[in-house]
């Protein structure tokens, strides 16, 4: 996306700030990375393949973690230390018409490429709120405070990098990402798409409006929201007036469903059942008829329902008391306004549902109109072992069962170790849990899945290849008297 900026226009009156190349910690000391928390990748550098040195397939790159110098197997050839080495893309600070200063690319930037770090003063959220109020009181228009984690923020107003000049856009070509660098969480600017030279860089501020002046957005995008934070709930509640009948709050457009009966849109089944979309269309087409004949519905509710009423699909049913039913009946008879039509329609639907038997729960429909039968019980290993004739087969299944139990116990104990950090840091737990503990959790989860796979594979293999233990005479006689009992077939 091209913006209205001239890279050849240098401009003047650069805002006063201190340029820094890494975050400044004033209220606390820099975290010292513990050796047990260092994440070591498994990359091996190949001189014939330059991308082998911690490229896109590096485990640390995948988890947004930079390699620690001295611990990476690729050594000095490691390419996953861009934050530490300040390997930024070439950019230029320019003056944008009507939008202050901005940053443009001076080279071709690939999608996903690291552009630069957003640096500033790392402060607590309490201090960030104080500074925001101070900036507003003194009329500071350009405040650069962004969220770092649940307890800290980055303020680039007085100290910062060139990333502080990147403007907002409703259709951005960049985005912010959090990376773990030597034990600290740092924010980087990355390209969302390929960016050509002389193109302005922009990312979505995700501004949340809580009151005060409304700042008009000047990004110029086709789908521009008009104001910063226009999509936030507070902005919409303060700006727009919701009138009766506004389709943005229409109940018909709100998907109400029971989680136990979560139905997906599918093709009509072979037995003639219509899909969810067809039922909703019938519901909408029927409402117009119900509104025009609201008083008639009140009288017909106790009698046999008409074909038109049978097409109405009620998604949620609430049990009403007899007093509520009488109140609805009185309201529908006293007033013939549009409001009465709505009340009468609801009353008619409730009376109709009360007089009829409730529909049975249907299974979740799948493609082709077939219903998937989900198993409700786990495999009973004890019963499986009794069916196996050889001692070797029984011992093998029991061995894998014991391994599965040990893996489950190990995973449960690790969760008890991680849980305090999750409860303390809530949504930012991924930034606070030690890397070594996270690696143990992943390893324990994989071991549990492998143990389950080995167990069930052993069961299937032994049942298919091992003769079934013959049943005694008493069991056969008991089965002969029960026609519905499942009988085992023995291979001869």
From Swiss-Prot:
Residues 266-275, 291-306, 328-339 have a biased composition (Polar residues). One of its GO terms (biological process) is vegetative to reproductive phase transition of meristem. Residues 259-340 are annotated as: Disordered. It catalyses: L-lysyl(4)-[histone H3] + 3 S-adenosyl-L-methionine = N(6),N(6),N(6)-trimethyl-L-lysyl(4)-[histone H3] + 3 S-adenosyl-L-homocysteine + 3 H(+). Residues 213-229 form the Post-SET domain. Histone methyltransferase involved in regulation of flowering time. Required for the expression of the SOC1/AGL20 gene. Required for histone H3 trimethylation on 'Lys-4' (H3K4me3) at the SOC1 locus. Prevents trimethylation on 'Lys-27' (H3K27me3) at the same locus. This is Histone-lysine N-methyltransferase ASHH1. The gene is ASHH1.
